[in-house]
Amino acid sequence: MPKMKSNRAAAKRFKRTANGGFKSGNSFTSHRFHGKTKKQRRQLRGLSMMDKTNVKRYKKLLPFK
């Protein structure tokens, strides 16, 4: 049986939380801020939790995290 490996692209983008969820950075944060309000920019700053419907898929990509 081949070695299990983490998907490196996913490992760079997602962090596992203590309760088994996943956090990731927000999209729409690299440029074109003139079209966004101050509130939108502030809310995009931190990390956000991934949707529960996708957690099963991420667990397969990152078996060791």
UniProtKB/Swiss-Prot annotation:
Region entry Disordered, spans: 1-52
Q: Which family does it belong to?
A: Belongs to the bacterial ribosomal protein bL35 family.
Q: Does the keyword Ribosomal protein apply?
A: yes
For this UniProt record, the keywords arranged alphabetically read as follows: Ribonucleoprotein, Ribosomal protein
Pfam annotation, one family: Ribosomal_L35p
Q: Which domain of life is it from?
A: Bacteria
Q: Name one GO molecular function term.
A: structural constituent of ribosome
Q: Where is the composition biased (Basic residues)?
A: 31-44
Tell me which SUPFAM superfamilies the record gives: L35p-like (SSF143034)
Listed name of the protein: Large ribosomal subunit protein bL35
One Gene Ontology cellular component annotation held by this UniProt entry: cytosolic large ribosomal subunit
- Fetch the NCBIfam families from UniProt: rpmI_bact
Instruction: Give GO BP annotations, semicolon-separated.
Output: translation
Q: Which InterPro entries match?
A: Ribosomal_bL35, Ribosomal_bL35-like, Ribosomal_bL35_CS, Ribosomal_bL35_sf
